[in-house]
Amino acid sequence: MPKRLDINTILVIGSGPIVIGQAAEFDYSGTQACQSLKEEGYKVILVNSNPATIMTDTATADKVYIEPLTLEFVSRIIRKERPDAILPTLGGQTGLNMAVELAKSGVLEECGVEILGTKLSAIEQAEDRDLFRTLMQELNEPTPPSEIIHNLDEAYGFVNEIGYPVIVRPAFTLGGTGGGICHNEEELIEIVTSGLKHSPVTQCLLEKSIAGCKEIEYEVMRDSNDNAIVVCNMENIDPVGVHTGDSIVVAPSQTLSDREYQMLRNTSLRIIRALGIEGGCNVQLALDPYSFQYYVIEVNPRVSRSSALASKATGYPIAKLAAKIAVGLTLDEIVNPVTQKTYACFEPALDYVVSKIPRWPFDKFESANRTLGTQMKATGEVMSIGRNLEESLLKAVRSLELGIYHLELDHLKELDKETMKKRIIKADDERLFIVAEAIRQGVTKEEINEWCEMDFFFLQKVENIVNMEREVKANVGNMEVLQTAKEMGFSDHYIAAAWNKTEREIYDMRKGNNMTPVFKMVDTCAAEFESATPYYYSTYADENESIVTDRKSVVVLGSGPIRIGQGVEFDYATVHSVWAIKEAGYEAIIINNNPETVSTDFSISDKLYFEPLTIEDVMHIIDLEKPEGVIVQFGGQTAINLAAKLEEHGVKILGTSLEDLDRAEDRDKFEAALTKLGIPQPVGKTATTVEQAVAIAEEIGYPVLVRPSYVLGGRAMEIVYRQEELLHYMKNAVKVHADHPVLIDRYMVGKEIEVDAISDGENVFIPGIMEHIERAGVHSGDSIGVYPPQSLSEKLKEQIIEHTIALGKGLNIVGLLNIQFVVFKDQVYVIEVNPRASRTVPFLSKITGVPMANVATKVILGQDLVEQGYGTGYHPEEKEVYVKAPVFSFAKLRSVDTTLGPEMKSTGEVMGKDLTLEKALYKGLVASGINIPTHGSVIITVADKDKEEAMEIAKRFHEIGYNLLATAGTAQSLAEQNIPVQVVNKIDSEDYNLLDIIRQGKAQFVINTLTKGKQPARDGFRIRRESVENGVACLTSLDTTRAILRVLESMTFSAHSMKEITQTKRHEVVHA
C-alpha cells in the first residue's frame, strides 16, 4: 500500500527532558522519525522541551517548537499550525500520555487531527491495566493472577486472597515509577500509596509475583497490511523482579529452546495484531524455567528503550521504519537501509552476541537505596558486541566508565558467604560482580541458582571467566593462554596486573606476536547478503571486514553512557563534530558504546565502531585506520581522560594540545596562567594530605569549597563550614594522595556567570554569556540559566568578555572552551575553565544560531574563525529571553537528598523562551514539571542563616494571597515582621504535623534550606523527601524561590487597600 496522500503536515511529539526511565533513546528515535517523514515529502512540525537534543535542531523538522509538553502549550501549537495528524509513539511515555490528554480535551476533534501509528484505543488497551488484562483473557494469553485497585482497601482484599509477595504496577507511568514488590504489609502500604499517586488515572495493577521466571522481550513491527515480524528477541540475565531497564540484557536470547522461542514469538505477534498497532511495539514475557508455562507481563505500544537497543543490536532502524509504516507504507515496500537490497519484511539474523549493562547513578548518590526492583533507577546504559557471551559481557563491563576493566570489584573480596547470599537474593547494581566473586570463593552454581534463579547457562559463562582468570595467573607469559583470554574478552589491563607488567607491555607483546583483533560488520543478515553499512565491532577471529580507504580520516571519541554530569549534550556536540568533519572533506570515524544515542546511528558517520572507550580498544581502531588525529573535545571527561595515554602511543590530539588541556585542568599550572594574565580567582590551594587540607582551610578561612581535581559534574564536591566536616569529607569522599590532589577554595557567595567561547588561537569568539539564578555554590548543571544576562552591568560584561578573550589566547585554546565566573562585590573572578564542549553548547547554539560544535571542529581542522565569518568578540544578544531549567529524577531514587549544592544531581534540562524573563521562567519551570498555582499554601522552614532573607520572600508570598505555614522558630521571626503565619507542628510531634500537611496535598510549595554543618539535616531530609514522594515543589535555594515568585507576581494582581498605597507614596516623598 503506497504512502498516504490525504495528509500533508504531521506534528511529532518529543519526549521532553531526560529523566530516569526516559533517556537519549528518544532523541535517537525522534530524530530518525522526523528525517524519515521528511524523506517521504511530509511537512514535519516538532514540539519538544529539551534543547540538548539533535531532535530539536532546526534542520530536523520543517518547524521546531521548544515549548513545554503540557496540554496548554501543545494545544496552542495545534490550533496555530493545524496539522493533519500527530505522531506520538516516538516520544516515549510523555508522547503517549500527551496524545491521550489531547484526545480527551477535544482539541484533536476540534482541529480535525488524526493520531498516526498506534490508535488511541490501542494506547489505552496497552497502558490501562484493566483493559489490557481483559484483552489478554480474550486472546487466551496467560497473565499472572491480578487485581485492578484504586485504593488501599482493595489492595488488602487481593493480598488476603493471594498472599505475598505481590507486584504493584501503576497505570500510565514511566520506568515503573511508583511501583515495586511488596513482601509485607508495611511495604504494601508504602508502595500502593506511592503507585496510586504517580498514576495519572489513580489506578494500579496488583499481581501475584512471578519473580524468578526468565524475562524475555520481543521487539515486533507490524504494518497496515497485517505483515508482522520480530526484529529482535532479548533475554534478561536477571530473572523477573528487576525492571528491564535495570537488567543486564543479552540479544539474541541465549537459553530458549526452539519450541520456547517459537511459542513466545507467536504470542508476541498475536498481541501486536490484536492491538492493531502500526509500527513498533515491545512485548515483555515471563517464562517458567521448568515448564512451558509463560505469562504476558506488559506491552509498550510505542518505540521504547528496548527498541533503541534492538536497532543498534541488529542494525535494523526501528524508529525510521515505524514512521514510514505510520504513513501507510508496508514492510514489503520498504528497502532495508542496511543491506539496501533486501526488504524490511526480512527478520534480522545475528551471528554475534550483544550485551547491555545499565549505568546507575550510585557513584553520585552514595546514600541512595541500591536495591533493584520494578522501579527503574539507571540513567543510561552501555552495549557491546562479541562473538561469545564472555567477550560481549567483559567488553560491556569496561564500557561503564567506572574505572573497571574486568568482572571484579576489589571491595567485594572482603565479603563473607552470608553477605554475598543476601545481596544476590536481593538484587543490587553489583549482583553480577558478586556472583563472580562467589564463584571465585568456591560457591557452586547450584547454590547461586537457588538464591536468585539466574539461569545455569549464564552462571556457567561467569564460571568460564573465573576459570580463565586462574589459567592466566598460572601461565605468566604464555602466548596460547593470552590468545584464549583475549578471545574471551579479557583486557590488557587485567592481564598486565596478573602478570605484573604494564598495560603497554602487554599491548606491545601482542603486537609483536600478531595477536590483534579484527573488525566484523553488523549487517542484519548474519553475512547472508552483502551489507552497505560501515558499522563494526572488534573480536579475535580470522577475517577483518573493515576496509581502510585511502581518504584522510579523523576519529571522534564519543561520551559513553548517559550519566549525571555527562548527558545527551555531549552526544549532541559529537554528532555536530562528525557532520563538520564530513563537510571539511575528511572521512569521519566515531567510537562510542551507548545504544541510546544519535551518534551511534550508523548513518551519521562514515564509519562507526561500537567499542569500549578504553585506551586498548581505541588503539586497536587507530592502528587499523591510521587517522590524521583524534578529537577529544566533544566526548566530555571520558574522552579528555584518554588524551594523555593516546599521546603516549604517538597519536595526534587535534585541537587544544595535551599540554594546554593539562594547564587548564591542573590547579597549580592554571593558577600560574591566571596570575600571568592578571585575572583574579578565589583564593585556593592544593592539598595532597589530610593535614595539608586542614592547614589550608584554616589559612583561607571557612566556608571553603573542596573537590578533587579532574572531575565532571562536580563529583565529590562540597561546601564545608568547619573542621570536622572537612575531616569527614577527606575520609569518606576522596582518597587523597600525590596523584589525586584535593582543591580547596575560598567559597564566595556571589552571582555565577557561564560563558562558552570558540578560539582558534588568535581569535576568540563568544556566542553567549549566561547568568545563573542560583548563587555560586549550586552546580552550574543544576542552576537555572538565563540568556542574555538580566542583571549584569555593561562594565561587568566587558570585564567578562576581556577575561574570556585573554584566557582563550593565553591558554592556547583551539576549539571550544567553557568558563565559569563568579561576581563578588562588583569584581569578576574565574572559578574554572573547561577546555572542551560543555553542557550548554546545544542550548546556546540553538538560541544564537551559531553552530558551535561545527565551527569549533572546523577550527580544529585548520579553518580559522575569520574564514568562517566570525571574528574576535561577543555575538550580538538576542531580543528574547531564554531560560534553561534543570530536571531531576528524585522520584525514582528513594533516600537521595534533594538539596542543591556543588555536586550535580539533575538528569536533564528544558528550555523556556519568551519576550520577558517572567514568561520565559514560567515556561521553563512548567516544562521542568513544577506546577505553579496562583494561590494556596507555602511551608517555610529555613536555617537560621537564611531567616533574614526568607522574610522578604515570605512577605511577597503573603502579598499575592498565599497562606504561610511555618514551624515555631520561623513563625516567630515572621510574626515579629508583622507577616501573618499559621504555626504548624514539627515532624517529631505525635499530633498533626508538617509531614501530614505535605502528604494530604495541602501545601503547594515547601521552602526548606539546609542548616549549616549538615547534621540537623535529618528533619530537613525527611521534609524534602516527603515533598518529592508527594509531588510537591520543594525549593532548597532561596534564589530559585525568588524566580518562582517573579513568575507568580507577574501572573497575579496584588491587592492593596487605598490607605496602604498612600502611605507608601508619602514614604517615598520623605526619602526624596
Curated annotation (Swiss-Prot):
Pathways per UniProt: Amino-acid biosynthesis; L-arginine biosynthesis; carbamoyl phosphate from bicarbonate: step 1/1; Pyrimidine metabolism; UMP biosynthesis via de novo pathway; (S)-dihydroorotate from bicarbonate: step 1/3
Reaction equation(s) it catalyzes: hydrogencarbonate + L-glutamine + 2 ATP + H2O = carbamoyl phosphate + L-glutamate + 2 ADP + phosphate + 2 H(+)
Alphabetically ordered keywords of this record: Amino-acid biosynthesis, Arginine biosynthesis, ATP-binding, Ligase, Magnesium, Manganese, Metal-binding, Nucleotide-binding, Pyrimidine biosynthesis, Repeat
Annotated stretches, region: Carboxyphosphate synthetic domain: 1-401
Region (Allosteric domain): 930-1072
Annotated Gene Ontology cellular component terms: cytoplasm
Positions annotated to bind ATP 1: 129, 169, 175-176, 208, 210, 215, 241-243, 284, 298
Residue span(s) of domain MGS-like: 930-1072
Secretion signal, residue range per the UniProt entry: none
Residues engaged in binding Mn(2+) 2: 298, 300
Binding site for ATP 2: 707, 746, 752, 777-780, 820, 832
NCBIfam families attached to this UniProt entry: CPSaseII_lrg, PRK05294.1, PRK12815.1
Annotated function: Large subunit of the glutamine-dependent carbamoyl phosphate synthetase (CPSase). CPSase catalyzes the formation of carbamoyl phosphate from the ammonia moiety of glutamine, carbonate, and phosphate donated by ATP, constituting the first step of 2 biosynthetic pathways, one leading to arginine and/or urea and the other to pyrimidine nucleotides.
The protein's name in its UniProt record: Carbamoyl phosphate synthase large chain
Species this protein is from: Bacillus thuringiensis (strain Al Hakam)
